Swiss-Prot record:
Function field: PhoP-regulated transcription is redox-sensitive, being activated when the periplasm becomes more reducing. MgrB acts between DsbA/DsbB and PhoP/PhoQ in this pathway. Represses PhoP/PhoQ signaling, possibly by binding to the periplasmic domain of PhoQ, altering its activity and that of downstream effector PhoP.
Keyword Transcription: no
Single GO cellular component term: plasma membrane
UniProt KW Cell inner membrane keyword: yes
Organism whose genome encodes this protein: Escherichia coli O6:K15:H31 (strain 536 / UPEC)
Top-level taxonomy: Bacteria, Pseudomonadati, Pseudomonadota, Gammaproteobacteria, Enterobacterales
Main location: membrane
Membrane topology type: Single-pass membrane protein
Family, similarity comment: Belongs to the MgrB family.
Origin superkingdom: Bacteria
Name of the protein in its database record: PhoP/PhoQ regulator MgrB
UniProt keyword terms in alphabetical order: Cell inner membrane, Cell membrane, Membrane, Transmembrane, Transmembrane helix
Length: 46
């Protein structure tokens, strides 16, 4: 039962990361000044 909780936690974390990636891409497309540095780093991450 404990293993299931770990799997659920990992799935939730992965979903959040994917969501963040989507938001980052949107911000980068709009060329928001605050995100420009993060976008430069984000280019190297597929």
């Amino acid at each position: 039962m404990k293993k299931f909780r770990w799997v659920a936690l990992v799935v939730v974390v992965l979903a959040c990361l994917l969501l963040w990636a989507q938001v980052f891409n949107m911000m980068c497309d709009q060329d928001v000044q605050f995100f420009s540095g993060i976008c430069a780093i984000n280019q190297f991450i597929p």
